[in-house]
Every structure is written in structure tokens, then in C-alpha cells.
């Protein structure tokens, strides 16, 4: 699952 937290970068 793609976590929005990882997309924060």
C-alpha cells in the first residue's frame, strides 16, 4: 500500500 507519508518527500 502506498503511504502518503512516503509521498511527503
Curated annotation (Swiss-Prot):
Where Phenylalanine amide occurs, the residues are 9
Q: Which GO terms describe its cellular component?
A: extracellular region
Which keywords are on file for this protein? Amidation, Neuropeptide, Secreted
The protein's location, in the record's own words, is: Secreted
Family membership? Belongs to the FARP (FMRFamide related peptide) family.
Tagged with keyword 4Fe-4S: no
Q: Where is the secretion signal located?
A: none
Q: Which GO terms describe its biological process?
A: neuropeptide signaling pathway
Name of the protein described by the UniProt record? FMRFamide-like neuropeptide PF2
Function, in words: Myoactive.
Q: Tell me if Phosphoprotein is a UniProt keyword of this record.
A: no
Q: In which tissues is it expressed?
A: Nerve cords and paired groups of cells located caudally to the base of the pharynx.
